[in-house]
Amino acid sequence: MTEITETKKEADTPIIPKNTNTTATTTPTTKQQPTKLISDEVEKDTSKVDFTKGGVEEFKFYPDNPKSHRHKYKWSMKEPSKFYDPCEESRMASMDCLYRNQDDKYACQEFFDAYRECRKDFFRKKRQDNRDGAKGWGW
């Protein structure tokens, strides 16, 4: 009869493998902050914005940086049915202009042109990377 009770006690105790550590670790997990790159930020201080940097072929009439490598990563990581806009700052500026001018699109035409140019530059970079065989766009 004592054998039966000992078997029940053994069945009630959990089986712990010998190689595992049963003490709880209390060390906090530190999460590394991603490094910020200069190309990640949009300059909001108007005194520091230089649209003519690099010569005539590099003129830029919008605050965004559509040629940034971060856009390639964000574009490839989005879900197929989701929308990603690399020129969000220009889009928001054109929409704010519409709100200020009571939906008068002709008053905000320069903002819309800047947004269109930003989108063209982004897709031009995407096509050029495709021609050059650069990977990372999700194809």
Curated annotation (Swiss-Prot):
Q: Where is the composition biased (Basic and acidic residues)?
A: 1-12
Q: What is its subcellular localisation?
A: Mitochondrion intermembrane space
Give each disulfide bond as a residue pair: C87-C118, C97-C108
Keyword Plastid part of the UniProt annotation: no
Annotated ranges, domain CHCH: 84-126
Q: Name one GO cellular component term.
A: mitochondrial intermembrane space
Region (Disordered) location: 1-40
Q: Does the keyword Disulfide bond apply?
A: yes
Give the residue interval(s) assigned to the motif Cx9C motif 1. Answer: 87-97
The entry's keywords: Disulfide bond, Mitochondrion, Transit peptide
Biased segments, Low complexity type: 13-35
The domain of life for this entry's organism is Eukaryota
Task: Report the residue ranges where the short sequence motif Cx9C motif 2 is annotated in this entry.
Answer: 108-118
Tell me which Gene Ontology terms the entry assigns under biological process. mitochondrial cytochrome c oxidase assembly
Family, according to the entry, reads as follows:
Belongs to the COX23 family.
- Known function: Required for the assembly of cytochrome c oxidase.
Q: What is this protein called?
A: Cytochrome c oxidase-assembly factor COX23, mitochondrial
**Which organism's genome codes for this protein?**
Candida albicans (strain SC5314 / ATCC MYA-2876)
